[in-house]
């Protein structure tokens, strides 16, 4: 990503969007059980989510879910997760370079920190509004329990879209847009800008070449910084999206209820699976993204040479 440090032909916007979407979907498939564990830990202690089963730690949560609800439960909501990455990650990551160039007006080499942050803000914000319905369905599918005696709210992904729209309202599919917007603005800026800066520093100071080890290390650093900053907003977003109608009058009310009933530590519930998930997700996505861009451009150049 993001600022090229080589003389290779630059990927087109279409190549970047396609590469981002494919890489994000692959990363989501591999790391989805960690995301499900994160959601369960985040809603633990909430009124409607309380049960006799307590989740402890990342592996403990995954093991408990597999034993009590079956292995498929770890991937409940995956179709919505894939839809989310297609509509969300492909735009926020794929358009980042193009928007960054727009803000720098092509005059800054390399682009300034302000241009990078502005690009992250814009692409993250636009992507949230487009992909929010998939986020709502994904979280609710991950949060609902299939334990004996508890009737699931939804029988499947598409049933969830229909039930939410008909029994609550169409606007409910955009429930939690405010905290999700805050979360993803933080994530997009921190993730992309940190990765961009880290990669640039490693390459420009000749510590690592612009290749897989550089991409891997940059992605890990970006994942940790992003998780640390986004965790409080992420927990509030998950609680608010998963809440029953009228449970929380507003996002601030949800945050205040968490603080008064569970204390400040509640805002960092699920931090370990969040970092494991986001760190591993970043590594898979960014490494695949970089390599896929290169291979697609090589293929395009080969086709151009033969025609």
Swiss-Prot record:
Most probably functions as a monomer. Binds one purine nucleotide per monomer. However, has also been suggested to function as a homodimer or a homotetramer. Tightly associates with cardiolipin in the mitochondrion inner membrane; may stabilize and regulate its activity. The chain crosses the membrane at residues 11-32, 74-96, 117-133, 179-195, 213-232, 267-289. Changing residue 146 to L: No effect on GTP-binding. Decreased fatty acid-induced proton transport. GO terms for cellular component: mitochondrial envelope; mitochondrial inner membrane; mitochondrion. One of its GO terms (biological process) is response to cold. SUPFAM superfamilies: Mitochondrial carrier (SSF103506). It comes from the Eukaryota. This is Mitochondrial brown fat uncoupling protein 1. PANTHER family: MITOCHONDRIAL DICARBOXYLATE CARRIER-RELATED. Keywords: Ion channel, Ion transport, Membrane, Mitochondrion, Mitochondrion inner membrane, Oxidation, Repeat, Transmembrane, Transmembrane helix, Transport. Changing residue 31 to A: No effect on GTP-binding. No effect on fatty acid-induced proton transport. Loss of fatty acid-induced proton transport. Mitochondrial protein responsible for thermogenic respiration, a specialized capacity of brown adipose tissue and beige fat that participates in non-shivering adaptive thermogenesis to temperature and diet variations and more generally to the regulation of energy balance. Functions as a long-chain fatty acid/LCFA and proton symporter, simultaneously transporting one LCFA and one proton through the inner mitochondrial membrane. However, LCFAs remaining associated with the transporter via their hydrophobic tails, it results in an apparent transport of protons activated by LCFAs. Solcar repeats lie at residues 11-102, 111-201, 210-295. It catalyses: H(+)(in) = H(+)(out). GO terms for molecular function: cardiolipin binding; GDP binding; GTP binding; long-chain fatty acid binding; oxidative phosphorylation uncoupler activity; proton transmembrane transporter activity; purine ribonucleotide binding; transmembrane transporter activity. Residues 33-73, 134-178, 233-266 are mitochondrial matrix. It is found in: Mitochondrion inner membrane. May undergo ubiquitin-mediated proteasomal degradation. The keyword Nucleotide-binding does not apply.
């Amino acid at each position: 990503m993001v600022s090229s440090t080589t003389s290779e032909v630059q990927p087109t916007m279409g190549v970047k969007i396609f590469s981002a979407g494919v890489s994000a979907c692959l990363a989501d498939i591999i790391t989805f059980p960690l995301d499900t564990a994160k959601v369960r830990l985040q809603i633990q202690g909430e009124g409607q989510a309380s049960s006799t089963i307590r989740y402890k730690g990342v592996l403990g949560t995954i093991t408990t879910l597999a034993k009590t609800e079956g292995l498929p439960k770890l991937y409940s909501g995956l179709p919505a997760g894939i839809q989310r990455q297609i509509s969300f990650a492909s735009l926020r990551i794929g358009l980042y370079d193009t928007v960054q160039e727009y803000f720098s007006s092509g005059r800054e080499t390399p682009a300034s920190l302000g241009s990078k942050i502005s690009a992250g803000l814009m692409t993250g914000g636009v992507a949230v509004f487009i992909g929010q319905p998939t986020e709502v369905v994904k979280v609710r599918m991950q949060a609902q329990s299939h334990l004996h005696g508890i009737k699931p709210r939804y029988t499947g992904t598409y049933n969830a879209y229909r039930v939410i729209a008909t029994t609550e309202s169409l606007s409910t599919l955009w429930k939690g847009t405010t905290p999700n917007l805050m979360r993803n603005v933080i994530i997009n800026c921190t993730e992309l800008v940190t990765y961009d800066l880290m990669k640039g520093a490693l390459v420009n100071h000749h510590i690592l070449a612009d290749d897989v080890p550089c991409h891997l290390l940059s992605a890990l650093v970006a994942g940790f910084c992003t998780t640390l900053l986004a965790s409080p907003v992420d927990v509030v977003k998950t609680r608010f999206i998963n809440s029953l109608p009228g449970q929380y009058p507003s996002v601030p009310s949800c945050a205040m209820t968490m603080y008064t009933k569970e204390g400040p530590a509640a805002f960092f519930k699920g931090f370990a699976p969040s970092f494991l998930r986001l760190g591993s997700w970043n590594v898979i996505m960014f490494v695949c993204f970089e390599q896929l861009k290169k291979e697609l451009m090589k293929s395009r150049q080969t086709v151009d040479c033969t025609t």
